[in-house]
């Protein structure tokens, strides 16, 4: 009887006693593990750690989610680069560029490639290419020099990964040195000089570079730059160490042209 009375008393006290709020337990995070990549929550390491077993179960997904977040960030960066580029090319080539570049192709989507860039890029030291979306970008340092839409040219330049050397910064990842610069000359389109009958724009924007070169550029000369183009295409035969050698090669016909504007410099290195 006494035991029954004690139980009833305890139950009654529990029913009338006010509920005391428990102290809030601070949210626990794994030290140094709260991460957001490019504003994308990876949902792996920034959740409350409620137990070791739960956390260990989540760890298997973290590398995958981190990778997905990083890829999303890269894609946004590439899209932004294309948007900036499209905004810039809508202005058209500058007067300074127009006389020394390959003009717009049939669809009007390419940018001019300066003869000076073609010449300087042969040494593969200052310029590099990088895949940006569906285009091939030509950089000097961090500055975007030219961007060629692959869909318009069927462009397939030769890429060669160059090993990193002392005191030289080479592209990383899918940024590769531009060692097929000569192929950029073989794109369809008109040139800034007075065009001959055999030098007209190509019909199809998706032909290969070789086909385009045969159909469009046979007999054509880009005023002031044929020597540069020839050396770019035949890069292995260029001896950059001797300017005298370059002069003699020009005199032997490599860079001959009717250069009425005098745009080719005497040493064959193009406009400075």
Swiss-Prot record:
Glycosylation sites: 134
Record keyword Signal present: yes
Highest taxon of source: Eukaryota
Cleaved signal peptide residues: 1-21
Signal recorded as keyword: yes
GO biological process: sporulation resulting in formation of a cellular spore
Record key words, sorted: Glycoprotein, Signal, Sporulation
GO-annotated cellular components: polar tube
Subcellular location(s) per record: Spore polar tube
Region (Disordered): 231-272
Compositionally biased spans, kind Basic and acidic residues: 234-247
One Pfam family from the record: PTP2
Compositional bias segments (type: Polar residues): 263-272
InterPro entries per record: PTP2
Protein's job: Involved in formation of a polar tube through which the infectious agent is passed on to the host cell.
Protein name in UniProt: Polar tube protein 2
Originating species: Encephalitozoon hellem
Gene for this chain: PTP2
